């Protein structure tokens, strides 16, 4: 039919619709076909039908059209059609099988697309829909009573395209949405309304279409966002609707039955005789009675079933007598119930009914079978004692089937019957029978529904009631069964599933769950246990203390040792044989080694399978190696040995997981770690080897088993892992778990494969080996070391190993503590095997175990010499070395490469503390001693001491060198203090050579001295941080010292006065300088006591290096010894008027030792003026200074030919001047640096005298201040008025200097901002900090007043009180000043005073007079000029270079930190006098002009050198110099 096709079409289209797709459609319904026909039909009954199908809550309310109407076809918009969607009104979609008596389906108008009901405008025509009242609120979606005939299509947009949707909406939206009311109309009025709606005004429809489009779009957008929620809600509602639909169907069925009855009565009245009516009425009565009987019967059956269940429940509760007592009753009950049922069936059917019904007593036609189906499932449980749950399910299923199938039966059977009833009375009877069947089915359905509801509501309460009332109920069962007529459904609650079955089921579930839980628990416990064990093992492996590891290692080693003593003995013998064999056939041996590697891998794999232990692998590796080395030894013995050993280790594995690594010193293990036994080329196996993971925690080297060691002579190489021996040596050592010493057997090459962690410096750091297993074949060979007969180049470290056994007893015992590369020269000469003896190498910390170097490995117990020589293999050393290498610092190891051969005994005696040898060399060897106990070669270099220095020669010469070093260091320190040639930074204890013969090498370092050029190269090759620059620098220094010595001490002396000399330095030189008559008074002879009592002026700046301090102390002591004359010198010598030109040559200081002389020469200040000619030679740095390699600060004095103003720098410049250095010098009224700062402030203003500070060359950039400026600065902190105007002659560009990058020694001008009260900051703020910092590196202390560690302004620490007092010009205790002076200028102590310099320390002036430390010009100015000499410009002004009183020295020390250059401004007359006087400077009391010397930092050594040259020859000051 049309309706059917429409419904099917809509259903199909609806099936294709999905919630994800949101069609925004505004559909105008075209004229509905058949509308007129529909209108023609008038249904007798108008009823609002309820939805038959579960519909989403959002779906349009189902519309039930009257039977007579033809459901309208669902309109199919083109868009919907194109999309495969049809939204429309479907007829009979909910009740597919229900037809009216005339064959018309019940019309249920349903929106086809329940999913999209919310998003799609309702397709139900307005005023057509009878909205289900329950869903009215949900169906109030925009509906349009009027729609255009033409459909308006709206594009389809995915849910996420909001922007596109908005754009379309904007385009299409022409008017505000018009909302229409949804009118609920009866179905009968639908067609007229429809016609009206078709004829609506096109304008209105158009507007509405637009508004509908807008609304639809908006609705679609909203729906798209809420689609998921709606979908869920729809699902829930659909389920609810399903339930409600069932109820509706039941109700409708009842109504249909009523209708059928009515129709029957009508038809009977119309077509039948009265007799038929009577019969029909009788049939109805009988049917009603029968239905009642059936209902009662069903109720009784249910009671019966419940009673049975109750019985079983009670029997379950009372397992004993109840079950026995009542079981028979259950059988009776079943029989009685059956009989009762039969009675019901037979008695319930009257004779009249029998005529209509088949003799069977139950209608079999149609769906009569349902009754049987219903009864049978219910009866079945009686015999089966099954839970009623199945029955419930069956009933539910049957009820559904009955609901679905009965309507079909009705429409198929009843409709024709009624049509033909008028023709044949038999048809009435059939109809009556079917009606009876229907009634029966309905009764069953009613009962079933009732039972279902009742059961659901009373399940829980019934359970409790049944359990409680079982006994009584069971007792009363027979009477109840006798009274089946009573409806008992309500009286007796249907029993739930029997307790026994439930209990059984629950018990099974519990048991299964318990089982699962137990299994899970076991799994969890296993996991936890495994995790705990692994954690424990890991903790043991990784977190174990070094001592614990060592202890475990020892225990394991001892046990293994005991187990394998015999095997080790055999291995030792085999090793000896193998060594001989290797010596004879090295190449064959190499091939064997390769095979051994393969075998070792195979054996390792096998052992791993057997042991499954990491320690096993190393053991197996060792085993394979041993097998190859010991071809004669039965493999079975090895297997047994290794298995036992591995088992023991496995036992200990948990306690000592890392012990395996230590144990794994076997050759195979080594081969695995270090690659192919030949050790040539890259060892690819290292990457795969598991040991690397254990490397860092690698057990410390195991006690060395005694090894037969060939006499090996060669440089000691510390390998990160172990020192490898040549293959031949390996034969001897191989039995001892061979370390990487196992090297190229044929070539006797040693590979040092560092097992230890890669030192932070893997590069050419001294002695640091790369702990990682790197193909050692690449290691660099130390060029200096003796070329081994067989040399394997290992990139990580140049390792030269001569496998041949050198006649010289081998010195290269490797230090276990620090696995540094030990260069083992195995001389090709192979000593006779008889010489071979197994020696246990004590662990030797060649590096003099640096604190960091003490690693777990280092904490090795004494070597276990007990091990058989074969077992002497270093087990832990690889790991230990890797750890130790990190600790050892580069440079310390290779300090000396010496050819000295020491006996093993000596070496051992020297190094008794090292119990475990890292290097195990086949042949005779000596344990490397900590080669150098003194400060490590470059103190700046890493703290680790010489880790793997070549020990051969060094060990023999070590004591001699140390003794020489002690003396030499003392001498050198004194010489350096005097000359200040070496920067404290560069100070290297060994490097400074005492003897001039050694000067070149010694200066370079003791290492060079001991090792020779080749040895020093070894340091470099080994990675020692000695730069070629450093070496060349050291050599140059030595050369410069030698040249200076050759030139003579005179220049050095000149340089000394030029630089601020420490009192100690002055003391040394003092005897040479005759005291001039005039000025000594100004400088009271307090100085000599001051030297002793030097107030400890603490330079807040960096303290001198330890060596420097020690040097100072020694120098002071020596100077006190040599400087007993100092007191005489203390009396100040009046500065002779002699021109400074003569001064430099005149300075006659007792020639210091050659080294000192050289150093003194070096101290000669560089010519800060560069090439500019200085007006006075005084300004020129003494020629000695030229020789000075790195004079730190060049003090240059420029004789002021010009007015003092010219000498005076603008105060802004002066402020930058570190007058701190000035304070360093004693306040000699004329020239003392401190005095010069104060005095010069005064004096410089007095006259433009030559500014020569006692022969001091004026460094370039040095600024001279007039006394006026100094005074002003002292009074207020540096005020910076533009003083450049006074300096116009010399400082015309001073103001511009602010904008120029500061020159080397330039003082940066400071803006005039009042007084900067921090003396240090005030000066440093002005100083170019960079030059100051450079000076630290570039200049020697001799030439600078600043200490080595002196910091630039920002870096400089706050001055101590004493320092501030010095800066402020307040006297500090003389002793401290002396101490600081000596500390700051360790090398000056020995220098002789320059001719003008007073040999005795200047007397300490008042606070104003003496500056105790570097002073700011402001501070100098701020201080009252207490020094009467300065204030009066006494003719007795001291020469600037006068030996500084302790206070001066102290101030110098402080100033030295600042590294200012102090330019002493003296009167030319003084300088002339000095020059004229020659060596005996005497100050003329009538010096008219005062010199102010400002010591400025000069940053460039070259500049300093130039300044020196200028000091010597150039009268012109360099452009950088400012006066």
Curated annotation (Swiss-Prot):
Keywords: Cilium biogenesis/degradation, Coiled coil, Cytoplasm, Cytoskeleton. InterPro entries: TALPID3. Residues 498-585 are annotated as: Required for centrosomal localization. Residues 1-16, 1099-1108 have a biased composition (Polar residues). Residues 1373-1386 have a biased composition (Basic and acidic residues). Residues 428-466, 499-528 form a coiled coil. Its main location: cytoplasm. One of its GO terms (cellular component) is centriole. Residues 1073-1088 have a biased composition (Pro residues). The keyword ATP-binding does not apply. Residues 1137-1149, 1236-1251, 1507-1523 have a biased composition (Low complexity). It holds the Pfam family TALPID3. Residues 1-20, 57-84, 1070-1112, 1137-1262, 1294-1313, 1373-1410, 1498-1523 are annotated as: Disordered. It is linked to Defects in Talpid3 are the cause of the spontaneous mutant with pleiotropic phenotype including polydactylous limbs with many unpatterned digits, vascular defects, hypoteleorism, abnormal dorsoventral patterning of the neural tube, loss of endochondral bone formation and embryonic lethality. Required for ciliogenesis and sonic hedgehog/SHH signaling. Independently, involved in regulation of cell intracellular organization. Involved in regulation of cell polarity. Belongs to the TALPID3 family. This is TALPID3 protein. It comes from Gallus gallus (Chicken).
